[in-house]
Amino acid sequence: MDKNNMNETLNVLETRRSVRGFDPERMPSDELIKEVVRAGEYAPTGRGMQSPRMVVVTNKAVRDKLSQLNAKVLGVESDPFYGAPVIILVLADRSRPTYIYDGTLVMGNLMNAAHAVGLGSCWIHRAHEIFDSVEGKLLLASWGIEGDYEGIGHVALGYALKEPAEAKPRKDDYTIWIK
């Protein structure tokens, strides 16, 4: 990797912020979504076992159903996905000892890639609770997903309504060096 590409990668990592307000009318193109998903597919996984699975939801009815289920777990009536038109659900195979870490790395890659291609994203929790429920398991089965998968998280994806706030300064004791 040349120095310019490395600097751009580091810039993406330092400037990505969670977006909590999306334009629900502005759907990213399939091409942009595929670029983001490809980054998720190349996330590191324990022993290269690729335990995660991703479900890309652009269907509004399914997206709204996921929002409703998430809001129910959270105990609110508002949209936990902040109006994002695309939801990427990350699941991971519980039979792999590193499944939670694998799924978490996929989530990180998805959010960083979204920023790199000009999209906003936000990690939305409660996938575990949703997809451990009877209704969640029925959804997985209807999508052809068999096995013992745990919901790791949802990535809310789309165009931000406004620029996210600047990053807070990093805490002084974030890193300890032992030389």
Task: Report residues per predicted region.
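Acidic, surface-exposed loops and disordered segments
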Residues: 1-179
